[in-house]
């Protein structure tokens, strides 16, 4: 279909008008004053207070992650992420506020690592998977990450700088 001068896919409403409507009282994305880490801000009234609760509330048998022939439901992903979270806490001493670097391709494990880290109050440091050893070293040093979760290719790169 070719649009004439009188037809348009663009609404006359501005982005600001739409946002104001969606975030107004009694609307799906109502914003209310709140505090996050001691800082006053606006937050979604109906949102779970933490990502951990969001992940927990999302548990179901619906497929969540599909990669090649691998399929994980929301529930399976939650269980796998919980296992990783326990390792981060019990074996590596990760506590809320600690940074955990994630360096890998777009594998299902990336999502699980993010879920695990944020569910225990950690800060996920997403590292560029294309970074070379020197860039990885800078990212790790600059972020203050206590742990690196990486795939085999990134671990091989990390091995070149690990002795520092």
For the regions a language model picked out, list residue spans one by one.
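Conserved AMP-binding/adenylate-forming core of the ANL superfamily
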Residues: 42-47, 52, 61-115, 132-138
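Solvent-exposed, flexible loop/coil residues
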Residues: 26, 33-35, 46-48, 76, ...
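Residue-level signal for pocket-adjacent positions within structured domains
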Residues: 37, 60, 122-125
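Structural core segment of the AMP-binding/adenylate-forming
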Residues: 2-20, 119-164
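Intrinsically disordered, low-complexity boundary segments flanking structured domains
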Residues: 28-29, 52-54, 159-160
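Flexible, non-catalytic linker and terminal segments flanking ANL/adenylate-forming cores
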Residues: 1-47
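Alpha-helix C-cap/termination motif
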Residues: 57-58, 91, 142, 164
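Flexible acidic/glycine-rich loop/turn elements at helix↔coil and beta-strand↔loop transitions
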Residues: 23, 54-61
